[in-house]
Design a protein with these regions (language model features):
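Beta-strand scaffold of nucleotide-dependent catalytic cores
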Residues: 18-21, 71, 116-119, 145-147
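Glycine/small-residue-rich pyrophosphate-binding loop that anchors the diphosphate of NDP-sugar donors
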Residues: 47, 51, 103-105, 113
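Short glycine/serine/proline-enriched coil/turn segments at secondary-structure junctions
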Residues: 29-31, 124-127
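C-terminal glycine/acidic-rich active-site capping loop/insertion
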Residues: 75-97, 104-111, 123, 130-200
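Membrane-embedded beta-strands that build the outer-membrane beta-barrel scaffold
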Residues: 6, 105, 115-117
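Predominantly a Rossmann-like dinucleotide-binding segment in NAD(P)-dependent oxidoreductases
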Residues: 1-97, 196
Length: 200
């Protein structure tokens, strides 16, 4: 609900021209120890391609901007060789951990907008956040750090709006009367494939 609400604000121009974004997928110690996640040959990479892509996709979607001009990034393999690591899914085998444990990027878009990308499976941070975004525009900004927060100026004062996106206390349904977001996403994708156009 928060992503769809924020997307509508962005589409309606409520935040103005979006020129800065932050794509965040940071885990403290949540390295997936099953399957081929840790194998560079079979997986292709670590947290950047596993969870970082979701946060980046969300940010690009909010900004409606998919044309990068320049990208600079760094990857780290600083914590993967530790033992007794406090991982949420048990200790990993350092010998089999051949992908990065953290990756960061700086993206400049063709129109000059800038996006910071942060992703990790293992990073010494206090507040992990996964698949969230922050966008800043000329009329306001928004972040998902602790639920959706929209900031703007009203009557010469700084304001923060925290929309109530709950369903009104119905425990078995967390929507707001609109259609399930996964159904909307699938419908948009199918429409794009069938009618040969970019997803909307």
């Amino acid at each position: 609900a928060d992503s769809l609400y924020l997307k509508k604000l962005c589409e309606d121009g409520e935040l103005g021209e979006l020129y800065y974004g932050k794509a965040i997928a940071l885990r403290r110690r949540a390295v997936p120890t099953w399957g081929v996640f840790l194998n560079e040959y079979e997986q292709g990479g670590g947290p950047l391609i596993d969870i970082g892509t979701h946060a980046l996709d969300l940010t690009l979607w909010m900004m409606d901007n998919y044309k990068p001009k320049m990208v600079v990034g760094t990857t780290f393999e600083k914590l993967k060789n530790q033992k007794d690591c406090g991982n949420a899914w048990g200790d990993w085998d350092p010998e089999k951990f051949t992908v990065e444990d953290a990756a960061f990027g700086f993206i400049v878009m063709e129109n000059g907008a800038t996006i910071m990308l942060e992703s990790s499976w293992a990073l010494n941070i206090r507040n992990p956040k996964e698949a969230i975004t922050m966008v800043c525009g000329t009329e306001g900004g928004a972040d998902m750090f602790d639920g959706l927060n929209i900031n703007f100026i009203k009557n010469g004062r700084q304001c923060v709006l925290k929309p109530d996106l709950d369903a009104g206390g119905v425990a078995f349904y967390d929507g707001d009367g609109d259609e399930d977001p996964s159904v909307l996403e699938a419908r948009a994708w199918l429409d794009a494939v069938i009618n040969d156009h970019e997803p909307r």
